Regions:
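Periplasmic-binding protein-like
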Residues: 126-138, 158-160, 196-201, 250-265, ...
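Segments of small-molecule ligand-sensing domains
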Residues: 325-397, 408-410
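Beta-alpha junction/loop-to-helix N-cap segments that form part of ligand/metal-binding clefts
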Residues: 87-88, 99-165
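An alpha-beta-alpha
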Residues: 173-230
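Short beta-strand elements at the ligand-binding edges of bilobed clamshell
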Residues: 156-158, 165-187, 201, 228, ...
């Protein structure tokens, strides 16, 4: 903690609150690596040149006037919700740069159209224009395409896909990974004395990911899986059949894990009761898909827990975003904000040439809108998540998110 306080004391005064939070954790790690003598003061951080009072108008595809260029690749020209999300992520990136206190960055905004070919071309163009890092794209196939180009040029990419199959060294995912949700909620349940677990999981790509994480985490906590069944999504008959198959095991369970969303969870609980399983006295568990006020209002979910970022950070970000752009952001807009803030911190603390795999993989991590996070060498991330509990028709924090990775149970 002493190191964190010292780091904070040497942060440049021009940093905005979000960037100061990111920089404090990054600086703490850098200072600790400089030597073992606590009394040795770190070298002063040079102040950034004063920004001009008035800047010339900029084109829509460029944000900022700094000397260090990074690319932001999004499906701005795609149709439907993809374009809406892309616009919101672009705005969030602009907000982050404005809050960065004169960061020496310039963002080159590129449209991939939501296609692999577009992402590959956008990445190539951005790197030819001098980008030293890529933020985005949004989808798994576009991250893979842009990441291939970035790796060939030894330029790091921080993307927003939740598909860990596209992550690798140099291609990092800042998204909310379902594996992290599962690990956090299972470990919390185990800390509350739960030892036997049953699960009903959707038979789809998401279900396969969370099932693998569940099978790995439960025994790691000293627990055992007494039943696990899959079901076809959207089918009441499939819910009923899966409930019958798992009924005997579920009766023995201390905790029931149902990683689904919307109307499916109450229907699955009803199917379990019809099969003779009484959920009373069993800990209901979900993932971030449960982070929905409509789901929380259902009495059948009372007492249920799931992992998610502490909502306070996002609410503050959403308020700042709405004040700046006149409408609320999409939920994933915080990812673009944190990715740009991350790049600004690295340039601020390590200089114009400082963006590298080593800097991005800082083991102390960074603190952003959605709490602390850090990247692993394989391109995936770890996040400090809160455990949320459904209570009285609402949602409250049952176990706060850790503020650092030192000694945190993640």
């Amino acid at each position: 903690m002493r190191e964190a306080m010292t780091a904070s004391s040497v942060l440049p005064t021009g940093l905005g609150p979000a960037l100061r939070s990111l920089a404090a954790i990054a600086l703490c790690s850098l200072m600790a690596a400089c030597g073992s003598t606590a009394e040795t003061a770190p070298p002063p951080v040079a102040a950034m040149p004063a920004q001009p009072q008035a800047a010339p108008p900029q084109p829509e595809n460029v944000i900022g006037t700094g000397s260090v260029r990074i690319a932001l690749i999004l499906p701005l020209g795609a149709s439907g919700n993809a374009a809406t999300a892309a616009r919101s992520l672009r705005n969030a990136a602009e907000l982050a740069l404005g809050e960065a206190g004169g960061a020496d960055l310039q963002i080159l905004v590129k449209d991939d159209g939501g296609t692999s070919q577009g992402a590959q071309a956008a990445a190539q163009q951005a790197l030819d224009e001098g980008a030293r890092a890529i933020v985005g794209p949004l989808f798994a196939h576009t991250v893979a395409a842009a990441g291939g180009v970035a790796r060939q040029r030894n330029v790091p990419l921080v993307g927003f896909s939740t598909d860990t199959n596209v992550a690798t060294r140099g291609v990092y995912l800042l998204s909310f990974l379902p594996e992290t949700d599962v690990e956090r909620v299972v470990r919390y349940a185990a800390s509350q004395g739960k030892r036997s677990f049953a699960a009903l999981v959707p038979d789809n790509a998401y279900g396969k990911v969370v099932e693998a994480a569940f099978r790995e985490t439960v025994p790691a906590t000293g627990g055992r899986i007494v039943g696990l069944e899959r079901y076809a999504t959207g089918s009441a008959a499939a819910y009923a059949e899966a409930a019958k198959r798992i009924a005997a095991g579920a009766q023995q369970a201390d905790a029931l894990f149902i990683p689904d969303a919307g109307d499916a969870v109450p229907q699955i609980l009803a199917a379990l009761q019809a099969a003779g399983v009484n959920p009373a006295g069993k800990q209901l568990m979900g993932t971030g898909l449960w982070d929905n006020p409509r789901l929380a209002a259902n009495p059948a979910l009372a007492g249920g827990i799931y992992a998610a970022p502490d909502p306070a950070g996002y609410r503050a970000f959403a308020d700042r975003y709405a004040a700046r752009f006149g409408s609320p952001p999409v939920r994933t807009a915080s990812l673009a904000h944190d990715a740009v803030s991350l790049m600004a911190v690295i340039v601020r603390t390590q200089g114009p040439m400082g963006i590298s795999d080593t800097a991005i993989q800082n083991p102390s991590g960074f603190s952003g809108v959605d709490g602390v996070f850090r990247f692993l060498a394989d391109g995936t991330n770890q996040r400090g998540l809160a455990v949320m509990r459904i209570e009285n028709g609402g949602i409250r924090v049952a176990d706060p998110a850790p503020r650092s990775f030192t000694g945190a149970a993640l």
